Amino acid sequence: MIALASPHLDEIRQHGERDYPFECCGLLLGRFETSNKVVIQTYPISNAREEEAKRNRFLIRPEELMRGEKYAREKALDVVGFYHSHPDDHAVPSQYDLEHAWPTYSYIVVAVESSKATDVRSWEMEADRSRFNEEEILPLPLGEGPG
């Protein structure tokens, strides 16, 4: 399960809408609590793919990932996951997403149709990297963790 406040979900939706028709991407910063992840902050990153490929792929450059990890450490947070959008497609990870994901992290996918975010779902990869399982998104009041 991943827990986050509605303003964080709004930030993800708005990022997807702003970057439409291209994929947006970013980090989910927070903490691991037993089998749950709690998002404290989103960390938007510019999609580094070449322009035409941005319609159905995103790329986080290693230096951007390192910058985000450093920022998280400075705030006493961890990278607990990633988010990206699927323009004019479903909020379901693609085969490409599966091939490039890592276990343990959450992957939030926002569907954006005609510049409007329509669905947000979260996924976690099996430990053997064979597939994603959908995970529950627990909405939290801002500043709270799961009880």
Residues of each region from the PLM?
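Conserved beta-strand-loop surface patch within small alpha/beta domains used
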Residues: 1-79, 87-147
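Conserved, mostly hydrophobic/aromatic
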Residues: 82
